[in-house]
Amino acid sequence: MKIIGILGIQGDIEEHEDAVKKINCIPKRIRTVDDLEGIDALIIPGGESTTIGKLMVSYGFIDKIRNLKIPILGTCAGMVLLSKGTGKEQPLLEMLNVTIKRNAYGSQKDSFEKEIDLGGKKINAVFIRAPQVGEILSKDVEIISKDDENIVGIKEGNIMAISFHPELSDDGVIAYEYFLKNFVEKR
């Protein structure tokens, strides 16, 4: 079975662990850089991107994650952290050739659920202070999901990033299955 690490320093970690189990993989909570050893993929969860970024700097994760040669899934704040820029001063991994509009859908009270397409399947996406892709900076970035005309899912190389929270939706397992099939199992 594949071991999928979940960056466990802030955010909705337990929900991702439950979702990983549903796709018959083993979740491993990543609290230190040493925990990155032996994983087949990494999930960077939603949470507060500025806080997660500062903690990644404090715990020495930035360079370690940048140098990983494994698939990475970023959800919500994870998408923000993987981007090249947000227009705000904050620590970023800068692994995806996109800029991000933080909190593009508004505040917490503006959160919503909406059915969108991901890889040819419908998924009930949960958007909580969700980001959107602002600008695509490379032809290597592929759009995998949209909310109307807004880009909410992309992939580039071995990285997938979505602006919604699949771990909070009953059918969110679709996103994890997509990641497993198109990234983890192709490794």
Curated annotation (Swiss-Prot):
Domain of life (superkingdom): Archaea
Gene Ontology molecular function terms on file: glutaminase activity; pyridoxal 5'-phosphate synthase (glutamine hydrolysing) activity
Key words, A-Z: Glutamine amidotransferase, Hydrolase, Lyase, Pyridoxal phosphate
Pfam families the UniProt entry points to: SNO
Active site: residue positions: 76, 165, 167
Catalytic activity line of the entry: aldehydo-D-ribose 5-phosphate + D-glyceraldehyde 3-phosphate + L-glutamine = pyridoxal 5'-phosphate + L-glutamate + phosphate + 3 H2O + H(+); L-glutamine + H2O = L-glutamate + NH4(+)
Ligand binding (L-glutamine): 47-49, 102, 128-129
CDD domains: GATase1_PB
EC nos: 4.3.3.6, 3.5.1.2
Disulphide linkage map: none
BP GO terms, sorted: glutamine catabolic process; pyridoxal phosphate biosynthetic process; pyridoxine metabolic process
Zinc as UniProt keyword: no
Pathway: Cofactor biosynthesis; pyridoxal 5'-phosphate biosynthesis
GO cellular component: cytosol; glutaminase complex
Function: Catalyzes the hydrolysis of glutamine to glutamate and ammonia as part of the biosynthesis of pyridoxal 5'-phosphate. The resulting ammonia molecule is channeled to the active site of PdxS.
NCBIfam families found in the cross-reference section: PLP_synth_Pdx2
Family: Belongs to the glutaminase PdxT/SNO family.
Description of how the protein assembles with itself and partners: In the presence of PdxS, forms a dodecamer of heterodimers. Only shows activity in the heterodimer.
UniProt protein name: Pyridoxal 5'-phosphate synthase subunit PdxT
